[in-house]
Amino acid sequence: MKKKSSQFKINYQYREYHYKPEELELSSPDKPPVELAKIHNSENVLGLILTFYVSFAVPARKTAQILRDVFCIKVSHQTVLNYAAGAAWYCHRFNLKHKGLIDDISAGDETYIKILGKHHFVFFFISAKNLKITAYHLADNRGTQPAVIAMNEAIRTASDDQKITLVTDGNPSYPAGIHFINAQFDGATTIHHKKVIGLQNLDAESEEYRSFKQHIERLNRTYKYHVRPAAGFNCTNGAVSLTTLFVTHYNFLRPHMSLQHQPPIPMLELKNLPTIQARWTKILSLAA
């Protein structure tokens, strides 16, 4: 029996990524043209704006109306947006500095938003036990590069001897990105990856790690609730700014029932402050 010469050929694809450090930088808000210390309104007004616009997910125009009709404070909706953008620049540094250690298992996913009518994607990672957001990154695609950026930040504060497992869906960008990250460690550290596929547990791995995937899905729903009033964004910086402020609110201000009504990252400096606006202004003072 004559056999074809190609019968036993094995075909496979191999990809090797070569990213420069400047290509793996987190998305961050632009530095504001006006310092918050020089604004015409008081710190309390700034705190109220962030309380309504971010913590309570009130649109910018309605936030301005509440301040005018309830507190007799005259600000425009553009002032609300400008103050939020200015605060986000400080809060981004605050988020990174005070993230702290991470759990052994983190879950990640991406969700879409619209900027100028086009889809963009926000990558999130959340710690399994303390439920804090360990990474956030905005990109115009769901490829390997933004996945690497988000995962690099997610594991940045891990201890040297920690065994890290990242749980994601079936997006091939994540295993490709983990392959790149592990190659940078030269075998000194190995990041493990677990996939949760679909809505039903059709394999043992999906069944075992489904609960971790549900953490990130709930986070995505909470994020969508907070950005929905914006009805899309007119610029990338606006999207990055609101995402950054959402992370500050989620990690440091928002009480979680499963954490005994404490935020994921409790801070002594915020504990005894009675109002949300006071906590916002305290965060900004700590970040300055």
Outline where the language-model segments fall.
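Basic, short loop/linker segments at the boundary and entry of helix-turn-helix/winged-helix-like folds
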Residues: 1-54, 72-76, 101
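DNA-recognition alpha helix
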Residues: 60-73
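Short, basic alpha-helical nucleic acid-contact segments in DNA-binding proteins
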Residues: 74, 82-101
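Active-site beta-loop-alpha junctions of metal-dependent nucleic acid enzymes
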Residues: 85-86, 136-160
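Two-metal-ion RNase H-like nuclease active-site motif
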Residues: 101-115, 124-126
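Helix-centered, glycine/charged polyanion-binding patches within enzymatic domains
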Residues: 171, 175-234
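C-terminal domain-tail junction helix/linker
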Residues: 229-288
